[in-house]
Amino acid sequence: MSLENLERINKLHVEAPDQEEIKNLILAASERLSDSQKTGLSYSSRFDLAYNASHGLALAALRAAGYRSDQRYIVFQCLQHTSGLAKGRIRIFSTCHERRNLAEYEGHYEKDEQLLAELIDAGNALLTEFQV
């Protein structure tokens, strides 16, 4: 579904890009991605850092396109329109969003180092799109 169609059904809101907001989202995400690779931290801390970094970058991409969403998962779904990432990498974000929700809201905790590594890799790929 296009960004315009998502706006039409009230999943997105048109909002002019704010360069300061976008810059700060990218900066915070960059720091979180870096911290997520510190092996001295627990798995859950590293996952939270990588997930929140990726969400911040996806939100920055959406904001740069002139939209905002009130729903976390939508920013990941919009990456097919707001980034050059391959669909496989975008699916990693969706999988991690589902895992995050299971852990946060249902107490289902599953440690998966491979998924975390893929999340960090996908987050770094998204971060690279913002670097000139």
Predicted segments with their positions:
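Terminal alpha-helical segments
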Residues: 1-132
